[in-house]
């Protein structure tokens, strides 16, 4: 089921609006300083502009906390519309929770200044979606007639169906409750939105459209599991754009078919080619995507939706990543896709299953820092992978693929570069120059407990070398209170920024 946005309800959907400062200017830029600092080594002419910070209110619209995925679409003359997902949830997570559930903001930016000219809620928190993570926008470059925003729930929580939910109901196996893990789409022009259950019930990090020149729409989606190491890569194929909205596509899971040494038995969990640790820097594997039964993809079996898909993937020897994050296609050759895996401490082989496991405390892991994978799709068939290799590895000192990054999370490409944002900890933004092959640090998040996220190529709107990104502070909140149950409710600090790095 899809729903069209009711703009008349927006005032009622703005949480805490009467308690927050209201900014009534036509064009607005946050008075807060940028939440990132450019590296001294960036080219001359580099700059960062802070656009809007969490908690700031414009004509009744409040920019919520935990901004994450970003998608861009043409706005009215002289502007670009920016859609931003918010990774919020009222379900307690490590002792804290947000004041509201996930939402999507729509913010118009003036192309000449980057200032905000208008803002509204594109998908309201009352729908009860949880933890919208990264996101992407598909448009004419990806074969879409309408600009379509893709995001998804990064959670496996089992919850009551929200009172305001209009696009989904309970799951049969756990009724009257439902489990998180929906992929969600939104039409940038009409405001219509809908979950796409057949895209897999999993911890969706991001979904992107891959314009490989095939006669089908091909969407890749990544599993940012909370139970690492047990993530998978999925492909959703649809005959046309409308079939995505009506969920008439099919879901497929990645499996290796061949290593450098020759073909492997795809069904054998001891084939030495079914997980992250089996693929080492310098290796070049091949693979295929195998079909996921529709009832399992949609989560309508007798098991909880995510449990059913995970069990099916293990039974069918689907390639096991550790914790998949963002992904982006190469704008020079769209059949090439870069995929981030943030890694995890204490990950080692499991001799009993032929897969991976996390060892006990003190175990020396083999994938602490994560990787970037490079996947090349077949020219004629999106279900065939001609090359699957390690592109950058944070745990392989001495190898040509070694990059001293820690836990890559969000990524995007331009015609010249790959940008990689680290998770919390180091929280650096890495710039990889396709022309020279070099890696360098472009910027770092100021708050050591925060992270940057959602980076997207904005060169079509703000000129070459332009990127829009956001920051999740984690270490500070705009507003917080402890509820009767002892849970810290918060509106976490965050910020949207425009970064320009000449040549990137």
What are the language-model segments listed below?
Residues 26-504:
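Sequence/structural signature of beta-propeller domains
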Residues 2-11:
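Bacterial N-terminal signal peptides that target proteins for export
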Residues 3, 22-23:
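Short hydrophobic transmembrane-like helices used for membrane targeting/insertion
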Residues 11-22:
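Bacterial N-terminal signal peptides
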């Amino acid at each position: 089921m899809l729903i069209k946005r009711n703009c008349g309800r927006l005032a009622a959907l703005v949480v805490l609006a009467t308690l927050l400062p209201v900014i009534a200017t036509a064009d607005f830029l946050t008075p807060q300083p940028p939440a990132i600092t450019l590296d001294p080594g960036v080219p001359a002419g580099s700059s960062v502009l802070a656009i809007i910070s969490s908690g700031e209110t414009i004509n009744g619209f409040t920019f919520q906390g935990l901004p994450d995925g970003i998608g861009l679409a043409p706005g009215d003359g002289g502007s670009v519309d920016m859609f931003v997902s918010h990774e919020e949830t009222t379900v307690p997570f490590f002792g804290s929770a947000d004041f509201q559930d996930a939402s999507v903001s729509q913010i118009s930016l003036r192309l000449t200044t980057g200032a905000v000219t208008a803002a509204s809620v594109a998908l309201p928190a009352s729908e009860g979606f949880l933890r919208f993570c990264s996101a992407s926008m598909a448009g004419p470059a990806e074969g879409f007639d309408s600009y379509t925003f893709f995001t998804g729930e990064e959670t496996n929580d089992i919850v009551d169906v929200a009172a305001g939910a209009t696009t989904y109901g309970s799951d049969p196996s756990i009724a009257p409750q439902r489990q998180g893990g929906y992929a969600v789409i939104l039409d940038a022009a009409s405001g219509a939105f809908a979950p796409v259950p057949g895209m897999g019930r999993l911890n969706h990090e991001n979904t992107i459209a891959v314009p490989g020149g095939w006669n089908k729409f091909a969407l890749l989606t990544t599993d940012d599991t909370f139970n690492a190491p047990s993530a998978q890569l999925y492909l959703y194929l649809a005959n046309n754009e409308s079939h995505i909205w009506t969920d008439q596509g099919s879901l497929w899971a990645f499996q290796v078919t061949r290593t450098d040494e020759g073909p492997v038995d795809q069904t054998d969990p001891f084939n030495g080619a079914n997980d992250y640790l089996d693929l080492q820097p310098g290796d070049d594997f091949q693979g295929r995507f195998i079909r996921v039964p529709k009832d399992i993809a949609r989560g309508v079996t007798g098991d909880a939706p995510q449990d059913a898909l995970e069990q099916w993937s293990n039974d069918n020897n689907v390639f096991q990543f550790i914790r998949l994050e963002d992904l982006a296609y190469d704008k020079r050759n769209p059949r090439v896709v870069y995929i981030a895996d943030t890694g995890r401490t204490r990950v080692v082989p499991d001799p009993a299953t032929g897969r991976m496991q996390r060892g006990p405390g003190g175990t020396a892991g083999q994938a602490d820092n994560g990787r970037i994978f490079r996947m090349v799709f077949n020219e004629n068939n999106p279900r065939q992978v001609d090359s699957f290799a390690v592109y950058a590895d944070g745990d392989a000192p001495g190898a040509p693929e070694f990059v001293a990054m820690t836990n890559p999370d969000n990524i995007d490409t331009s015609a010249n570069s790959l940008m990689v944002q680290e998770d919390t900890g180091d929280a650096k933004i890495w710039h990889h120059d396709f022309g020279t092959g070099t890696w360098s640090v472009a910027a770092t998040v100021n708050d050591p407990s925060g992270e940057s996220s959602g980076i997207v190529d904005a060169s079509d709107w703000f000129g070459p070398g332009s990127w829009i990104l956001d920051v999740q502070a984690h270490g500070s909140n705009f507003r917080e209170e402890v509820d009767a149950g002892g849970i810290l409710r918060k509106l976490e600090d965050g910020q949207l920024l425009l970064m320009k790095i000449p040549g990137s």
